[in-house]
């Protein structure tokens, strides 16, 4: 589970769940083929498409020093109809 950091739950990602598309943040150095192979192997699903984009880091100030957070990559994984990925984290009660 080195490639995928965590699942993303935003308004857009929740809307994409209806189209059988799952969104997650992955390691910046990971390639599409690595992530596709890992998802198919770990979850036992068939991936038909993957879209990715790199999100920029944000500026952070600590007193007089200006810094920034690291950039990261987000993948939108489309599965074949009939397949699904269970939630990666259960809801707290």
Swiss-Prot record:
Keywords: Chloroplast, Plastid, Ribonucleoprotein, Ribosomal protein, RNA-binding, rRNA-binding. Pfam families: Ribosomal_L23. One of its GO terms (biological process) is translation. PROSITE patterns: RIBOSOMAL_L23. Binds to 23S rRNA. Its main location: plastid. This is Large ribosomal subunit protein uL23cz/uL23cy. The lineage of its organism: Eukaryota, Viridiplantae, Streptophyta, Embryophyta, Tracheophyta. It is found in: Plastid, Chloroplast. GO terms for cellular component: chloroplast; ribonucleoprotein complex; ribosome. Part of the 50S ribosomal subunit. HAMAP family: Ribosomal_uL23_B. One of its GO terms (molecular function) is mRNA binding. InterPro entries: Nucleotide-bd_a/b_plait_sf, Ribosomal_uL23-like, Ribosomal_uL23/eL15/eS24_sf, Ribosomal_uL23_CS. Belongs to the universal ribosomal protein uL23 family.
């Amino acid at each position: 589970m080195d490639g995928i950091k965590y699942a993303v739950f935003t308004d857009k990602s929740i809307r994409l769940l209806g189209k059988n598309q799952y969104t997650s943040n992955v390691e910046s150095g990971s390639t599409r083929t690595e992530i596709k192979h890992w998802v198919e192997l770990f979850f036992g699903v068939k991936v038909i498409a993957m879209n990715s984009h790199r999100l920029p880091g944000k500026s952070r100030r600590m007193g007089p020093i200006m810094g920034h957070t690291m950039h990261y990559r987000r993948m939108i994984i489309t599965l074949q109809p009939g397949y699904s990925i269970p939630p990666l984290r259960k809801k707290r009660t």
